[in-house]
């Protein structure tokens, strides 16, 4: 996926209020593209996040906060920060085998599983 396509996906995700940050990771967990540098995701954090997804761990860490993984399969991820109110993580594998991951604000018009489905739909569009 090239940067122009990534930016198109970010625009599609931003059609709904609440997307705080979007990342594209490759299969090794390296950051290919990111939508902002406000709260930068480190390479180590990206690799740990992808490892938690692939190995179906019960939780993941993002920006030093724990997110309970509520949905975790080969193509979709949905995780919620329950205790700290830090929002949600929704992700999907893309057609080319990369991983599109969005950090979502805690209060939006959609619930987490709807976000997970939406991120998947955008990733496969």
Task: Describe the role of every protein-language-model region.
Residues 1-125:
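Non-catalytic interaction/Regulatory regions outside core domains
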């Amino acid at each position: 996926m090239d940067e122009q396509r990534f930016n198109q996906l970010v625009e599609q995700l931003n059609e709904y209020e609440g997307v705080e940050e979007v990342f594209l990771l490759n299969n090794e967990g390296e950051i290919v593209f990111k939508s902002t540098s406000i709260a930068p995701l480190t390479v180590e954090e990206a690799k740990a996040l992808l490892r938690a997804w692939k190995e179906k761990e019960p939780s993941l860490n993002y920006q030093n906060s724990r997110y309970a993984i509520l949905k975790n399969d080969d193509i979709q991820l949905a995780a919620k920060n329950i205790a700290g109110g830090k929002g949600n993580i929704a992700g999907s594998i893309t057609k080319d085998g990369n991983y599109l991951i969005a950090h979502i604000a805690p209060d939006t018009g959609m619930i987490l599983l709807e976000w997970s489905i939406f991120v998947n739909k955008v990733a496969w569009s």
